[in-house]
Structures are given as structure tokens and as C-alpha cells.
Amino acid sequence: MFLERGYIATTLEMIAQTAEVAVQTIYNTVGSKRDVLNGVLDLSAAGPSAPRPVREFMQERVAATQTTAEMIGVLADWFVEAGERTAPIQQIIRQAAAVDPEVAQLEKQRARQRFENYKLAASALAERGAMPREMTREEAAGLIWTIGHPGVYRFFVLELEWPPARYRAWIESRLLAQFG
């Protein structure tokens, strides 16, 4: 509904009516409209058949890799997968953040959440001895965050019309240049 009508025009009453529940049920189970938007982003990121939250299954994917190059391949795959699934809802969040302080706060929280998740990836790289000696884990997380940012996907794939395979190869080459 957010994608069809936009954030501002979508009300909790509309969402409740579509879901055939009372508005109070949404408040009790999910929370505010901002919380619903956050939940939509979570579901979009995880994908339709995700068995667990993103953080958990990504840790499993990374742990299953044998080499740094394989791990970087997992990250590159993830950035493409997540970009494809979340680009539309990320656009809604970006637009709504410009006019709604609660959504602006959500956007900041999600950016921080991605950064914290990429600290885990940086730690995995450090454990493999793949980080340059002068680079801190926080700096490595910042580099991964920057390369994997939803805005980078939007620019290269949606605006420049790069095929996802080219975008993936670009991510992989940039990360391998730093950590490979």
C-alpha cells in the first residue's frame, strides 16, 4: 500500500481495512505507521522465504565461506539481493523522511543498524587476517556500509541502468581491492 499510495497518503485505517483487522490490532501487534513501514522494510530485505532475520542468516552465510573471496562474494550477492527487494520501499522512506520526523529517525536508525551489522562482517574479515593493518574494524565497517548503501544500488542499477551482474562485479572488485 505504501508503494501504491505513498507514506503520507497511506493511513493505518487503510492498512487495517486491507488486512481485515481493527486499527487497534495494528497498534497492539506492530505499533505506529512508522513501525509498519519499518516492518515492511524488514520483510522486503529478508525476502519472501527467509527462515530467520537477516542478521542471523547472513552470519550463517558468512560462516559457511572458506576464503575471504568467498565471503566477499556473499556480501556482493547480498547487496544485489537486498537492493532489488528494498529499492522501492527505500524510496518511500527517503521521501517520507523529508516531511515526517519519525520516518527521518527511522532512516537514521536503519543506517546505524546496517553499520552495526557490517561491523560483524569487518570482524569476520579481521579474524581471517584480511584487513589492512592500519584499518580499524569501524573503518572497515564504514567502507562496507558505503559500498553497500542502498543509495549506491539506486544510482548504479536504477539510474545508470547497470545490470545487477555488473553492479555485483563492481562491489566484489571494490571489496576485494580492500580486503582480498
Describe the role of every protein-language-model region:
Residues 32, 86, 99-101, 150:
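Short loop-to-helix capping motifs
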Residues 77-94, 102-128, 138-142, 173-180:
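Amphipathic alpha-helical packing segments from all-alpha helical-bundle domains
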Residues 33-35, 39, 46-84, 141:
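Hydrophobic alpha-helical connector segments
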Residues 1-4, 57-61, 89, 143, ...:
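Solvent-exposed, amphipathic alpha-helical segments
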Residues 126-173:
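Hydrophobic/aromatic-rich alpha-helical bundle segments in the mid-to-C-terminal region
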Residues 7, 95-100:
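Short helix-capping/turn signature of helix-turn-helix
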Residues 1-35, 39:
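Helix-turn-helix
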